[in-house]
Amino acid sequence: MSSVFDEYEQLLAAQTRPNGAHGGGEKGSTLKVDVPVFTLNSDDPEDRWNFAVFCLRIAVSEDANKPLRQGALISLLCSHSQVMRNHVALAGKQNEATLAVLEIDGFANGMPQFNNRSGVSEERAQRFAMIAGSLPRACSNGTPFVTAGAEDDAPEDITDTLERILSIQAQVWVTVAKAMTAYETADESETRRINKYMQQGRVQKKYILYPVCRSTIQLTIRQSLAVRIFLVSELKRGRNTAGGTSTYYNLVGDVDSYIRNTGLTAFFLTLKYGINTKTSALALSSLSGDIQKMKQLMRLYRMKGDNAPYMTLLGDSDQMSFAPAEYAQLYSFAMGMASVLDKGTGKYQFARDFMSTSFWRLGVEYAQAQGSSINEDMAAELKLTPAARRGLAAAAQRVSEETSSIDMPTQQVGVLTGLSEGGSQALQGGSNRSQGQPEAGDGETQFLDLMRAVANSMREAPNSAQGTPQSGPPPTPGPSQDNDTDWGY
C-alpha cells in the first residue's frame, strides 16, 4: 500500500506545480499597449520639481486616458533618478506593454519643452499641458496638494527638490499596500502610515496629496499590470539594496514590509499556529490531508522564487491555491490557537463559512492547556534544573488562572459567537456571578457602590450650593422667555 501513498503525494505535487513551469505557454499573443513615459534630461532643481508636478497632474487628471496615466505614474516614480532613461528601461522589460519614451529638455512657463528625438509636436505638447490642468473637482485649490501654492514654491536646491519628490513618492507607495486587497477600506491605514512617515521626516506636511488623488493613483495601479510589474521590480531592488545607502530604496524597503505576502495571511497564520506549535493534535487522522496540502503549498511557495511574496500584487493565479478553504480543518484549528495565544489576531477577521467549529474549539482548548507547558528544547538550551522547570510551570499556571478570573469581555474568545459568558455576567452584576469567583464579584460590587456614591454626591453638590433643593424642574439654559424684562421692551 505504500506505493499508493507515494503516488498520491506525487499527484498533489503535480497539482500544486506553479503555472508556466513547463514553459509551453504562448508569449506575445495579446495586443500590447503603447504607454508614453516621460523622462527629463535636465538636473536643474526647478526643472526636476516641475517635471514631478507635471507627471503627478497627468497621473490624476480626469482627461487623461489609462495609458497616459500609467506612463505618468511610472515617470513620477523615476523622477528621483539621475539617468531617468535607464530607470525607465527597467520598466520596459515586460510583455504587457510597450513604453514610448518622451524626452523633456525643460519647462518654460509651465509648458514642457520636448526634445526633437521624441517627435512631439507643439500642438501635442499643448494638449499635454491642458490634460495636466484638468484636476478632479475635489482639488478645491486647483492643485493636487492640500496646501495651496505648494507646487508654485521654487525649490532652494537639489536637496529640497529630492525631499519634495520623496514626499510624493512615499504617498504613492503607501497606496500600493492595499491596491489589490481591501482598497475600499484603505483610507485609515494609509493615513496612519503617512503620519508615520511624517514623524520620521520622510514626508513633508506641505506636500500631502488630496485623498481623491491617492484614490486615482490606486485605481491606476489596480487596472495596470504593467505598472504593477514595475512596482514589483522596484520592491525587489529595494530588498537587495543595503540599508542606509539610498534614501529612496530605504523607503521602498520599508513599504515592502506592508506589501509582502498580502493576501497570504491565512496561509502563514496556519503555519505559525497550526504547524509550528507542534501540538499532539496534528496526529489526528482527520488533519493528515490538510497537513499534506500545507506541505505541497510550502514547496510551491519556494518554487515561485522572488515573485512568491507578490503573487497578490501581480494577480498570479497560483494565489488561489493558498486560500484557507484548501485546508479548512487545519485552518480552523490554527485560528482557535491564535485567538488565545495572540490577541493581535483579533483585528484579523478569520471567520469563514467553511470553518469547523469543533476544530476551532479544539484549538482553543489546546492553547489554554499549553499556556503553562514548557518548551523542552529551550529548557535544555537554558539548562534549567527540574526544580526551575516546576517553578516556571507553577508560575505560568498561577498567572493564567489569575488572568482568567479577571472579567475582560473585549478580550474573551468569542469570534464565532460575538459574545462571551463573562461579558453577559458583567452586565447582570456581581450577584449573578459563579460561586467559584466570590472575590471578583465582591470587588465589582464595591466598585459599583463607589461609583453610585460619587454620582449621588455630584448630584447633591449643586443643590447644597443653592441652599434649598428645587421643587420643580431645572431651569432652561439661556435667558428666560417668560420674563418681560428680557424681551427688549
Swiss-Prot record:
Residues 403-489 are annotated as: Ntail. GO terms for molecular function: RNA binding; structural molecule activity. Residues 421-489 are annotated as: Disordered. The keyword Hydrolase does not apply. InterPro entries: Paramyx_ncap. It is found in: Virion; Host cytoplasm. One of its GO terms (cellular component) is ribonucleoprotein complex. Residues 1-375 are annotated as: P protein-binding. It comes from the Viruses. Residues 422-437 have a biased composition (Polar residues). Residues 1-402 are annotated as: Ncore. The keyword DNA-binding does not apply. Keywords: Capsid protein, Helical capsid protein, Host cytoplasm, Ribonucleoprotein, RNA-binding, Viral nucleoprotein, Virion. Coiled coil: none annotated. RNA binds at residues 178, 193, 258, 348, 352. GO terms for biological process: negative stranded viral RNA transcription. Homomultimer; forms the nucleocapsid. Binds to the viral genomic RNA. N0 interacts with the phosphoprotein (via N-terminus); this interaction allows P to chaperon N0 to avoid N polymerization before encapsidation. Interacts as N-RNA template with the phosphoprotein (via C-terminus); this interaction positions the polymerase on the template. Ncore is globular and carries the regions required for self-assembly and RNA-binding. Ntail is an intrinsically disordered monomeric domain in the C-terminus. Forms the helical nucleocapsid (NC) in a ratio of 1 N per 6 ribonucleotides, protecting the genome from nucleases. The encapsidated genomic RNA serves as template for transcription and replication; encapsidation by N is coupled to RNA synthesis. Forms the encapsidation complex with the phosphoprotein protein P. Before encapsidation, the newly synthesized free N protein, so-called N0, is chaperoned by P. Belongs to the paramyxoviruses nucleocapsid family. This is Nucleoprotein.
